[in-house]
């Protein structure tokens, strides 16, 4: 069992229940999935950029990403409908907790000039989104083998009813807020 999952079941659930004043342990919010998204700007001109993004995402997430395609043509961006423009991965279960553990314990401390994540990035329903500017903060990505620096979006989807519950959940996991 993943370290964070066992900590959540043994300690964090009761701690969050007491903090939020919930009556039943089943009302305690939990993380349902983590979605990683990497948009590749120049993928329409150079197909090798997308291959590099897929390789980086596979190393970071531990599973092969699905390639996302443009929904409609945009002349200003020089893309057409159905052209590949990025990749994404949805993590659930054990892999989700393993990724969250690596994110909090290893990747976030390696971010340069990091002062904590904004507590305002919740969506109103307890889900949290954050962006990472460089994929090299993850130790799985070899610095010598990358062709260029890429950022990625991370969305943590929770079963929380509102932002207060989502913030309490992520704070219990040790998420560094400002």
Curated annotation (Swiss-Prot):
Keywords: Ribonucleoprotein, Ribosomal protein, RNA-binding, rRNA-binding, tRNA-binding. One of its GO terms (molecular function) is rRNA binding. Pfam families: Ribosomal_L5 (PF00281), Ribosomal_L5_C (PF00673). Signal peptide: none annotated. One of its GO terms (biological process) is translation. InterPro entries: Ribosomal_uL5, Ribosomal_uL5_bac-type, Ribosomal_uL5_C, Ribosomal_uL5_CS, Ribosomal_uL5_dom_sf, Ribosomal_uL5_N. It comes from the Bacteria. PROSITE patterns: RIBOSOMAL_L5 (PS00358). One of its GO terms (cellular component) is ribosome. Belongs to the universal ribosomal protein uL5 family. Part of the 50S ribosomal subunit; part of the 5S rRNA/L5/L18/L25 subcomplex. Contacts the 5S rRNA and the P site tRNA. Forms a bridge to the 30S subunit in the 70S ribosome. This is one of the proteins that bind and probably mediate the attachment of the 5S RNA into the large ribosomal subunit, where it forms part of the central protuberance. In the 70S ribosome it contacts protein S13 of the 30S subunit (bridge B1b), connecting the 2 subunits; this bridge is implicated in subunit movement. Contacts the P site tRNA; the 5S rRNA and some of its associated proteins might help stabilize positioning of ribosome-bound tRNAs. This is Large ribosomal subunit protein uL5. The gene is rplE.
């Amino acid at each position: 069992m993943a370290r964070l999952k066992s900590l959540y079941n043994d300690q964090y659930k009761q701690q969050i229940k007491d903090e939020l004043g919930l009556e039943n342990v089943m009302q305690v919010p939990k993380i349902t999935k983590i979605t990683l998204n990497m948009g590749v700007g120049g993928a329409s001109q150079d197909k090798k950029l997308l291959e590099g993004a897929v390789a980086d995402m596979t190393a970071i997430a531990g599973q092969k990403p699905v390639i996302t395609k443009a929904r409609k043509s945009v002349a200003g961006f020089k893309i057409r409908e159905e052209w590949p423009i990025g990749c994404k991965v949805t993590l659930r279960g054990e892999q989700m907790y393993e990724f969250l553990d690596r994110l909090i314990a290893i990747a976030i401390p390696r971010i340069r000039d990091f002062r904590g994540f904004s507590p305002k990035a919740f969506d109103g329903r307890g889900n949290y989104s954050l962006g990472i500017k460089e994929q090299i903060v993850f130790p799985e990505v070899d610095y010598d083998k990358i062709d260029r620096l890429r950022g990625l979006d991370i969305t943590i989807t929770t079963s929380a009813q509102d932002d207060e519950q989502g913030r309490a959940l992520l704070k219990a996991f040790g998420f560094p807020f400002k």
